[in-house]
């Protein structure tokens, strides 16, 4: 065992201790007074060992990616690789979701009393619904919105309203949409890493972007869809600053960034990632006008329709403290959230982040491409830590932070023995999905 691998295992052991501490402390808090409002701390889940129709498929996909993922990622033509990543990520996510069965795992996930599909009929008149949106955020308001509708800008709900208008109504189509679109996040991160670092690192990261425990929550939660939209906004920006059809990709990035902040208030933190991409690019000044032009389109449309983003955000903060966020203890969740993140990204990412830190501390001795990928990963970590310290993400971060944790998976590009680490990733995901009944 070489020194680097030994240090990787030390980092994984420390991460495992963090998860163990969060579980033990969480159980103790629940026994004393259940203010955590989660079933199996630190995760929003319940202990329920089970199998389902997705079990054979999930094992098959896992074995296939472990065995064939690294060589295929190294040999496939570049144009085919993002498509292959998307297909594999979609197969992995669908199979994990189906471990809970079609209805419980996919079709009914977005139809509970907390979710967006509960209010589709209240958007028959979309302009009026947008004008009145802020009037239904607080719990004391008439016909207040369900938690997830109140907790997000209306762009999130409008996604499912428009899907319904297209004739694809109901929980099944909504579940299929968020899984299919969410799986494209793997391709978006891949494109970004190639544009800003190099193709070799992107190819090494590819299997880790696919075979991640994060897929347990990407199927089926709307946050997986949000993660994909944000990831493509960054990917298009990376293409723009590196000279790939700069005007078109810059405009597309701006449009998606504008949509991103109207899907989730917390995704304004992607300003950090966008700044990092601009700093890593060589054409930042030329493309900024196009990014800005695209950026104003979606916010302007919502504003003209009568939705006040800032008013809604301030009301959301109040609503958050009216519910579980008001009694969930910050002193526990500020570090237990990080334990959730460990379970989402898996041991390979922990080891990869350890190696990222080592490369950044040896700045001049590290290859330029590795330093650039390291800075991108630091931006993702900074977003995650800012969300954590804000106190607006107490629990359920295994899904809420998917837009941030998706980027950390690229740290897998730095590890040696990829098949062993991919096996660890798959094993963790399969255990989580089969031993726990997760909320999403």
PLM regions and their residue ranges:
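Start-transfer (signal-anchor) and selected internal transmembrane alpha helices
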Residues: 1-19, 41-112
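Membrane-lumen/periplasm interface segments of specific transmembrane helices
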Residues: 21-34, 259-262, 276, 280-358
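Transmembrane-helix motifs of polytopic, lipid-linked glycan transferases
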Residues: 64-71, 173-196
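Specific aromatic-rich, kink-prone transmembrane helix
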Residues: 188, 226-243, 249, 408-411
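Membrane-interface alpha helices of multi-pass inner-membrane proteins
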Residues: 210-217, 248-276, 294-300
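Short acidic/glycine- and proline-prone juxtamembrane loop motifs at membrane-interface regions
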Residues: 214, 218-226
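Perimembrane helix-loop-helix junctions
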Residues: 234-243, 247-251, 268-294
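Membrane-interface helix-loop-helix junctions at transmembrane boundaries of multi-pass membrane enzymes
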Residues: 284-289, 354-379, 418
């Amino acid at each position: 065992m070489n020194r680097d691998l030994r240090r990787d295992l030390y980092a994984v052991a420390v991460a495992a201790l963090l998860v163990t501490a969060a579980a033990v402390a969480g159980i103790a808090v629940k026994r004393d007074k259940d203010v955590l409002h989660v079933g199996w701390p630190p995760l929003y889940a319940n202990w329920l060992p089970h199998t389902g129709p997705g079990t054979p498929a999930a094992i098959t996909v896992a074995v296939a990616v472990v065995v064939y993922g690294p060589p295929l990622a190294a040999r496939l033509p570049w144009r085919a690789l993002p498509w292959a990543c998307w297909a594999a990520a979609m197969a992995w996510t669908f199979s994990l979701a189906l471990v809970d069965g079609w209805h419980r795992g996919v079709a009914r996930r977005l139809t509970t009393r907390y979710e967006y599909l509960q209010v589709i009929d209240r958007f028959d008149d979309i302009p009026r619904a947008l004008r009145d949106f802020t009037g239904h955020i607080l719990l004391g308001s008439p016909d207040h919105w369900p938690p997830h509708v109140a907790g997000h800008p209306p762009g999130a709900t409008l996604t499912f309203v428009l899907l319904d208008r297209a004739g694809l109504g109901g929980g099944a189509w909504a579940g299929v949409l968020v899984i299919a679109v969410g799986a494209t996040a793997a391709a978006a991160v891949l494109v970004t890493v190639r544009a800003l670092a190099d193709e070799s690192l992107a190819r090494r990261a590819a299997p880790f972007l696919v075979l991640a425990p994060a897929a347990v929550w990407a199927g089926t939660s709307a946050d997986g869809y949000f993660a994909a939209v944000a990831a493509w906004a960054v990917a298009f920006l990376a293409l723009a600053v590196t000279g790939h059809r700069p005007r078109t990709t810059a405009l597309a990035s701006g449009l998606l960034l504008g949509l991103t902040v109207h899907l989730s208030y917390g995704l304004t933190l992607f300003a950090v990632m966008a700044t990092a991409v601009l700093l890593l690019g060589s054409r930042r000044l030329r493309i900024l006008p196009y990014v800005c032009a695209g950026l104003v389109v979606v916010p302007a449309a919502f504003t003209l329709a009568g939705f006040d983003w800032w008013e809604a955000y301030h009301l959301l903060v109040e609503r958050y403290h009216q519910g579980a966020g008001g009694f969930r203890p910050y002193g526990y969740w500020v570090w237990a959230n990080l334990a959730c993140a460990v379970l989402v990204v898996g041991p390979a990412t922990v080891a990869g982040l350890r190696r990222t830190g080592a490369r950044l501390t040896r700045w001049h001795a590290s290859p330029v491409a590795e330093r650039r990928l390291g800075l991108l990963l630091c931006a993702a970590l900074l977003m995650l830590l800012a969300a954590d310290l804000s106190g607006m993400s107490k629990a359920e971060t295994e899904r809420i932070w998917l837009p941030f944790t998706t980027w950390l998976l690229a740290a897998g590009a730095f590890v040696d023995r990829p098949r062993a680490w991919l096996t660890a990733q798959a094993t963790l995901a399969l255990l989580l999905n089969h031993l726990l009944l997760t909320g999403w």
